[in-house]
């Protein structure tokens, strides 16, 4: 964890990502990438010389079988405010639009919902648990399923 925190700190400093008094939202899906991002930023704020806060946000998209109670417990342990937002993404994509290749529409709806939530909460910075492999995967999925190149 120390190595990861060192890398996160260096990245934040090199790119001047956090200013004094910022609130950084973390988009939390419940997957390992977003949870590591949340934990890293929550721990970083304890020793980082520039004061900032962390706020976790989960979009509850209506996907069957999803439960975020463990995320809520983790946020309490980390002393991080947690907002869960109900958005009808699953219903729109599968019931209304009946998409056969839902990835692009789902991603757009989630991004739009997340941006709206950030605006409503007055938060101007967000951290997502995406990495280079995610970008490659998205590029290949778009190429194979939609016949276009894009991320």
Task: Give names to the regions the model predicted.
Residues 1-149:
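ATP-dependent adenylation/nucleotidyltransferase module used to activate substrates
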